[in-house]
Amino acid sequence: MKEPSIVVKGARAHNLKDIDIELPKNKLIVMTGLSGSGKSSLAFDTIYAEGQRRYVESLSAYARQFLGQMDKPDVDTIEGLSPAISIDQKTTSKNPRSTVATVTEIYDYIRLLYARVGKPYCPNHNIEIESQTVQQMVDRIMELEARTKIQLLAPVIAHRKGSHEKLIEDIGKKGYVRLRIDGEIVDVNDVPTLDKNKNHTIEVVVDRLVVKDGIETRLADSIETALELSEGQLTVDVIDGEDLKFSESHACPICGFSIGELEPRMFSFNSPFGACPTCDGLGQKLTVDVDLVVPDKDKTLNEGAIEPWIPTSSDFYPTLLKRVCEVYKINMDKPFKKLTERQRDILLYGSGDKEIEFTFTQRQGGTRKRTMVFEGVVPNISRRFHESPSEYTREMMSKYMTELPCETCHGKRLSREALSVYVGGLNIGEVVEYSISQALNYYKNIDLSEQDQAIANQILKEIISRLTFLNNVGLEYLTLNRASGTLSGGEAQRIRLATQIGSRLTGVLYVLDEPSIGLHQRDNDRLINTLKEMRDLGNTLIVVEHDDDTMRAADYLVDIGPGAGEHGGQIVSSGTPQKVMKDKKSLTGQYLSGKKRIEVPEYRRPASDRKISIRGARSNNLKGVDVDIPLSIMTVVTGVSGSGKSSLVNEVLYKSLAQKINKSKVKPGLYDKIEGIDQLDKIIDIDQSPIGRTPRSNPATYTGVFDDIRDVFAQTNEAKIRGYQKGRFSFNVKGGRCEACKGDGIIKIEMHFLPDVYVPCEVCDGKRYNRETLEVTYKGKNIADILEMTVEEATQFFENIPKIKRKLQTLVDVGLGYVTLGQQATTLSGGEAQRVKLASELHKRSTGKSIYILDEPTTGLHVDDISRLLKVLNRLVENGDTVVIIEHNLDVIKTADYIIDLGPEGGSGGGTIVATGTPEDIAQTKSSYTGKYLKEVLERDKQNTEDK
């Protein structure tokens, strides 16, 4: 019987050239090929898109409007499709409330565990809270000052949606006269209609009393009635005082600290019942940072030391500052750091109640006199941020503010009550500070009583199962409270991968995009085993991947190429990895079999005396690291995932240099000192973020070559005759562009129930320019024709104009010859965007004082692309510049001049320097995981060289 398969016929999405392919079902399929060859076009834009579209099509029109409909991919037929799930890197939640624990649903089970077997303790006296008797409640109320007026309330509805009409009617029938609804006392017969879509709290007024001797019996009776009405809860409304809360279940006998019935929502920082009231469950507060307000303390007040008050169109703040200095005799020509502590305090935090009179010039002209108390710069920024109706003002003020842990909950996000409940000796805030491996160990060995163990058994099973999956995909170093927005693309993808395994679905088509990103070689085997486990459940996995180990582990390997862009889009080879390795046409096969490889350099640049010295780096998990980064060579920072590479390079090195050199507002991670910054004059972070967020941005505009091309067109005879300047050939401004589409070339048509449709502009036929502009030509081509050329074509076309050719040649050198000059920035992959940035740096004149920082530049790159990338990076170093790379890819690591290896483990087990030196030095370091794998690669390459 024929094995089931997915049959694709006539796929033409993007650069795919009408390809037909049959893929075996229930197998691990890896698609590979050069960057831009068409892998994602086949995997995501064809197979996944059609699988998803067919599923959505089966839903009702009502449901479809919420899901949004996917376009039908450009393909003739696809047979044998299963429901498709895509696990890519782009869908990480940036919501500050989203954490590793919430995304994986582990937190839901932990909350349930605390609600079922948690033991509440009084935070003031550290004793377990037992249930309160009516007598204890009476005694506590009688301690109130004599003649205090009180109302006994029975909470019958606690923060629940609904209009609650029936309940209110029943309360009236029982003879109760008053209610407190959402804090307001109302007559039971005059209750306004409640909005059923809002949460409400309803309390019955059971009795109203004045505290005095002799009311104990009546008080006890009323308390019993209230407890019966509200299932054991009682609120005492102390007139002109704070409410007292009592519970038949939980309260401290010494201080009366009481806690309501334990329920899961009490432990949720996304619920008003559990969230810290100060920070609303965010764990952080935006606070004015003095270091951002006065970034350069060597400046004087006259030189603009207080940055937010540097003069603008109104001189209100500079005049106020001048007057304050006159009143308090503060020298405005003295460096800020040399002012006395008292003087700095007055400037930053205000002058108390003393009023100051001054006259300032208004924005519209004219002068005005004001008398006011000087509040201080810090309170002024805070007030304007919180109270200003202007979005612009709030944005400007936020530049001088930093997220700091909330003072009430100390960053734990939860209320005092929630943090007073313990299981196994820890509260929920302490548990989520554990890394995944620590939490797994804790829950496997948790010590519970026999009764609690019976209750918690099923919950613990779910928690341990999910933690095990996360551990198995190499994420053991992540803490449970880590914010989702701070995860790398690879980490976020592996979290979703672990969640999917936990769901135990079968018969599904999973499409994954480079799950090995950010993963050290040590953890690769665990990831591959996870993928195989998903396959063995009866699922089909299509993985777009360049990783050597993953390709070798595939059941079926598809090599797409042979080149990129126009030169790709074909199936070069497919079959088992062994079959592809034997195929001489397959570039991937040649690299896999060792016939082609990236060579180890014959000569490594020695580390010179010129260096950046970092001392006492303590950002995140770094343990007071001291390290030297040599200048004018290529340094690669390595280490297992979570070892502290990004903390050292991005948080400490980049941010501190950006702050000093670029005068950036970023706040670096903690460190004692950094020396050697004066040897640099430029720091550039070349990441994989888009080169522009609108279709108007493209490689030509980003690299600046489009300016030169517009100059050429403005110099043509036709342009001179017509009086056209350079601006005429811009599609961003009026004049030369087509006004029907405002220079976009496309028009958006909104469709209800269907996705928005983009159609070429009928007026300019998608050319972006008006007819008159397009009549100007250079060598027979108009400006729109130039934008449609590939970089390779344009390089030949402008070969006689050195300025343009030089810039275009750098794009060819980084492997982007296939991209069109006018390709929209939004359609470039992360790897392509990064290489456009590299190209724009390459054609600039080097000073030899620049430092380039790259975080995993091999993401999305084939081995052949990596080879090209390394040549480009070496060109930067040959100019005398410095390159610092965070990388796991052994081909990059083996070509480095110098390596800084962090570890030894991830998370709390990392954050120290394991070894530094040349790749050969690291390979000899027994304690280095990187060294172990590097040694194998260096020996294999040496063997291959000798065999030749």
Curated annotation (Swiss-Prot):
Keywords: ATP-binding, Cytoplasm, DNA damage, DNA excision, DNA repair, DNA-binding, Excision nuclease, Metal-binding, Nucleotide-binding, Repeat, SOS response, Zinc, Zinc-finger. Pfam families: UvrA_DNA-bind, UvrA_inter. GO terms for biological process: nucleotide-excision repair; SOS response. Its main location: cytoplasm. It is found in: Cytoplasm. One of its GO terms (cellular component) is cytoplasm. ATP binds at residues 33-40, 639-646. A zinc finger (C4-type) spans 252-279, 738-764. CDD domains: ABC_UvrA_I, ABC_UvrA_II. InterPro entries: ABC_transporter-like_ATP-bd (IPR003439), ABC_transporter-like_CS (IPR017871), ATP_grasp_subdomain_1 (IPR013815), P-loop_NTPase (IPR027417), UvrA (IPR004602), UvrA_DNA-bd (IPR041552), UvrA_inter (IPR041102). Residues 309-587, 607-935 form the ABC transporter domain. Belongs to the ABC transporter superfamily. UvrA family. HAMAP family: UvrA (MF_00205). Forms a heterotetramer with UvrB during the search for lesions. This is UvrABC system protein A. The gene is uvrA.
